[in-house]
Amino acid sequence: MINLKIGQKLQLEIERMGINGEGIGVISGRLVFIPYALPGEEVLVEITENARNFSRAKLVKIIEKSPNRVKPQDRAYHEMSQSHIMHLSYPMQLEFKRDVMRQALEKYKPAGWRNYELRATLGMENTLGYRNKLQFQVRRLNDGTVIAGLYQEGTHHLVNLDNCLVQDPKTQEIINHICRLIEKFDLPVYDERKIGGIRTVMVRRSQKTGEVQIIFVTSTPIILDGQVWPELREEPSKRQKNSFVKFDKMLSALTEEFEEIVTVAVNFHPRKTSEIYGERTQILFNEKETITEGVLDYEFELSPRAFYQLNSEQANVLYGEAVKALNPKKDDRVIDAYCGVGTIGFAVAKKVKSVHGMDITPESIFDARENAKRLGLKNCHYEIGKAERIIPNWNKSGHRATAMIVDPPRTGLDDALLETITKFPPEKMVYVSCNVSTLAKDLVVLANFYKVEYIQSVDMFPHTARTEAVVKLTKRDEPLKIVKFEHLEEERKAEAFAKGKKRGRRPQKYGKY
């Protein structure tokens, strides 16, 4: 195998795209990953990193351009994330996202994977302005200018996103105005080295009603109407007081400028961690404590901290596909794991005997219960906690599920939940995935107990390498093999350790597109 040196320039042809959207070329049997390069292109690249089995390079020049290459519309495109694919025509983005699923299956090889039906990705007509929520870090530059945006991938460089084209225009307008108000009222802004103040701002807008809710995350207490929150146990020093965020003028100016704002909250997060939120949240302004959103044929309420899909338009497509895959029957007893505010469960509640959901976020379960009441769904029951703890209790109390919906975070299903599912397998199951790699990994276990009927890819995030998928699973008459979960857990821990050791750093939890 050829030895490549850092800084070495070479010419190669791009053969395919990798799971993160990068182009992949091969030189003397060695894989080279090049962000922003497309299949079929002849490119000049410069080697930036060498690992044992592959190299990474940056694109220097496109010698022969792909007919599928288009000019990115977003001026901050190359700074935001190397997994963006705005340079690829949209029809080919959809095909790429189906291929990403194929690559993940080929890597993990769950039982029968070659015969899985991979359906064409369901895309959008308008691929800009689709993100209903932003969660931007805030920083003050040396000249006093306040910017808001996201960290450049793998760095602590904050990219100023003052005109992000995939963001809902109203949320973008509001965050830009917030930055100007912070400057105007000289409010303290967080600096991870020495200064406390505002560190993150979340703005979410309902696509159904236009209502807006905002969360300010601060590392220091706030002052509103002369009151300090959170309450302090001892008198603060003068230096500490100077870092307190005086919210009176900001709150008045913001709510007067934007009549769409119905909720403003503050979250106190004093610790120096990469977690976005702290444990305590206080409502500052509440014309309404929730916003009203809609999906399929019903409406529901969302608290500021509750989870909901970032793309409201495609959420209709995603949840519609989930309902279709479940094929609900009147005698079905459904478990909605990772239920959030209950959105998928509500879509089937009137067609089944019962829906039992759980989530670890208290705000989400509160919203789920209130939404169920408002919708008149008396057959819905929700609990706070982990599925692997709650499901066995439900089984003991007589609620043995015949159908299950899982919609886990990007980390996939917890091993304990996988074990619980295999001990109490429902007759049918729908897996809604936001990470094809962890989906394929989970199918290694699930495919022993369930037949994969099909996988339907849904494009929730146009112009990024991310995709979501709905998997229809039907219980097998007999398991293909018995899975030893103690070995599975050891293997995954070893894999995670090796990945972390190879990267040489802890993964960033700050948001990126």
Curated annotation (Swiss-Prot):
GO MF annotation: an example: rRNA (uridine-C5-)-methyltransferase activity
Organism, scientific name: Lactococcus lactis subsp. lactis (strain IL1403)
An example Gene Ontology biological process: rRNA base methylation
Ranges where the TRAM domain occurs: 3-61
Family statement drawn from the similarity comment of this UniProt entry: Belongs to the class I-like SAM-binding methyltransferase superfamily. RNA M5U methyltransferase family.
Record-listed E.C. numbers: 2.1.1.-
Domain of life: Bacteria
Matches recorded under NCBIfam families: rumA (TIGR00479)
Keywords: Methyltransferase, S-adenosyl-L-methionine, Transferase
Active site positions: C434
EC primary class: transferase
Family annotation (InterPro entries): MeTrfase_TrmA_AS, MeTrfase_TrmA_CS, NA-bd_OB-fold, SAM-dependent_MTases_sf, TRAM_dom, U5_MeTrfase_fam
Protein name, entry field: Uncharacterized RNA methyltransferase YwfF
